[in-house]
Design a protein with these regions (language model features):
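N-terminal lobe/hinge region of extracytoplasmic solute-binding protein
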Residues: 60-109, 140
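Long beta-strand-rich cores associated with HINT superfamily self-processing modules
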Residues: 493-526
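Gly/Pro-rich hinge or "lid" segments in bacterial periplasmic/extracellular proteins
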Residues: 170, 175-235, 243, 524-525
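Ligand/substrate-recognition segments at binding pockets and active sites
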Residues: 359-427
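Ligand-site clamp/hinge motif
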Residues: 220-267
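Structural transition elements
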Residues: 323-361, 379-383
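Periplasmic-binding protein-like
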Residues: 291-335, 470-480, 484
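Extracytoplasmic/peripheral linker and loop segments enriched in polar/acidic and small residues
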Residues: 43, 50, 402-409, 434-497, ...
Length: 526
């Protein structure tokens, strides 16, 4: 008992000592804010989430060129359009398709009937809903424009669904991936011919005496979606030429520009920049006059003419390497472009000379060998220089050749008074060659139409695995001979656009996170 009392006394003394040593902690230097502590002297605002740094973007535009996306084909103005408008589907630089305005789609079992529905949340900058009528009117108007019409070759009808909520596309041949062609910006049905129609994109064009700007849409239907452009207002600088665009980028405030190295007006950039190369769809090629040229009477020449075309040297000498030499009608990075197959038809002067030995060169009534006449558009100086060099090279290898340089290129082309022509065309994203080979096709002059190649083209549209067979047959036949493929060059001030991922016709490409499989409705069985 005495030990127990002694223990209690010791504990009591210890408690007293501890209480005497305890100091009251002064918490007045800290202010609780829920998820953070502020040090003495700090304001609560100091720990507020920081807004993303302003980019202070400035873009160039041509005020005298169209800003209606259904008619405006200028690639500088289309930079603005990629922020002002949205398509049913966006296509990245690798040809991957992502839904934007499309909220759902159906496809028939035979892939010839496609139905698309607008995302029910989609709105224009004025708050009105995007409708199926708008989509239909947009595509009907786009079909009239040379810039888009090549993607409509196999679309034979477009109508609203019975309930008016969707748009039906009827095709004359099965399509594996019709959405790849449906990246046309959608505008209101009542504004398809407006100078600057309203769009559903994150920015709206505003003009004033103090200058034009792109202003961020405050209540954008996509909310706070992160896109490459973050400014609330983007300044615009009016320009008048490609050289002006370059100078505004190199010495002025312009942040992002797009150029076409295959254009006669291309201005070279000589400053510090970040660069993206985006396939443009522009293909330079040779077309043969099978119907009227004596050089192609027996079809021999076109089977080996490809070996006499020094594509790599032409691309380097006349475009400073800013074009891709090709022997197949597709961009080299395309999944359809088979390099092993392409290499079989590349430049080989020895093979050309060897094959030329078994070819009978036509002669005139005096026994003089006829020149192979190369028609070329005299308004394209780079193409003229290539045609001249080609004529010189062929002549040196034993095939006399000369150029026919015409300012009225189309008239001479339709007259078909040439042997071959050095042409330029813009292929759709699926590299459709229909107009070369279908009966009475717009690009079939000189007898290029060909039933077998036309059917093989349709087979490739139905199943992309058939492109190899199509390209092999075409390269062996040689009625059209690809020379080089172009790309756009997108320049940005270094470090300014870390999230930029430009695509053809869509410099400010972005995705909403939707997927094709996620919005597909059950297949329709006929």
């Amino acid at each position: 008992m005495r030990k127990f009392l002694s223990l209690l006394l010791v504990l009591a003394m210890l408690a007293g000592i501890c209480s005497g040593c305890t100091k009251k902690i002064d918490n007045s230097g800290y202010v609780p804010t829920g998820d953070a502590l502020l040090m003495e002297g700090q304001d609560p605002e100091d720990l507020m989430p920081e807004e993303e740094d302003a980019q202070e973007l400035t873009l160039a535009y041509y005020p005298d060129r169209k800003l209606n996306p259904l008619f405006g084909s200028d690639y500088i103005n289309r930079i603005l359009m990629s922020l002002m408008y949205q398509p049913l589907f966006a296509v990245d630089n690798n040809k991957n398709v992502t839904p934007i305005l499309c909220g759902g789609y159906q496809v028939s079992a035979n892939s010839r009937t496609w139905t698309f529905y607008v995302d029910e949340n989609a709105k224009y900058s004025d708050g009105t809903k995007v409708t199926a009528e708008d989509v239909l009117a947009t595509y009907q108007k786009a079909k009239e424009n040379d810039y888009y019409k090549n993607r409509f070759y196999h679309i034979w009808e477009m109508n609203l669904t019975e309930d008016g909520k969707g748009v039906i596309f009827g095709l004359d041949t099965p399509y594996e991936n019709l959405p790849l062609l449906l990246d046309v910006p959608i505008v209101k049905a009542t504004e398809v011919e407006a100078v600057i129609p309203l769009g559903s994109g994150p920015y709206i064009f505003q003009d004033s005496p103090s200058g034009a700007v792109l202003k961020r849409v405050e209540d954008w239907w996509c909310g706070n979606l992160k896109i490459p452009a973050t400014d609330k207002e983007i300044s615009l600088v009016a320009v008048s030429s490609a050289a002006d665009v370059r100078d505004q980028f190199q010495f002025g405030d312009v942040s992002v520009v797009c150029a076409n190295p295959m254009s006669d007006s291309f201005a070279e950039y000589r400053c510090d920049y970040e660069l993206w190369e985006i396939e443009s769809g522009y293909m330079m090629y040779i077309g043969c006059n099978i119907l009227y040229s004596p050089h192609f009477d027996d079809g021999t020449l076109r089977t080996f003419l490809t070996y006499g075309i020094d594509r790599e040297r032409y691309a380097q000498d006349f475009y400073k390497g800013m074009a891709e030499p090709v022997t197949l009608p597709a961009f080299p990075t395309s999944p359809y472009y088979n390099k092993a197959l392409a290499d079989q038809f590349a430049y080989d002067s020895l093979k050309f000379i060897s094959r030329l030995g078994s070819y009978r060169i036509p002669t005139n009534d005096k026994g003089v060998q006829d020149n192979l006449v190369i028609l070329v558009n005299s308004n394209d100086s780079a193409r003229v220089r290539i045609a001249r060099q080609l004529a010189k090279d062929l002549t040196a290898m034993g095939l006399p050749a000369a150029t026919l340089e015409a300012s009225n290129f189309k008239d001479v082309y339709y007259a078909q008074t040439w042997d071959i022509y050095l042409g330029m065309t813009r292929l759709s994203a699926n590299f459709d060659l229909t107009e070369f080979f279908r009966p009475y096709g717009e690009m079939g002059k000189g007898g290029l139409s060909h039933e077998v190649l036309y059917n093989m083209t349709k087979n490739a549209l139905e199943n992309s695995g058939n492109y190899y067979n199509l390209y092999q047959k075409l390269a062996e036949d040689g009625r059209i001979i690809p020379v080089m493929y172009g790309y756009y060059t997108v320049y940005a001030q270094r470090g300014l656009m870390p999230d930029l991922a430009p695509a053809r016709d869509n410099v400010f490409y972005y995705s909403l996170g939707k997927t094709m499989s996620g919005i597909q409705i059950d297949t329709v069985y006929d």
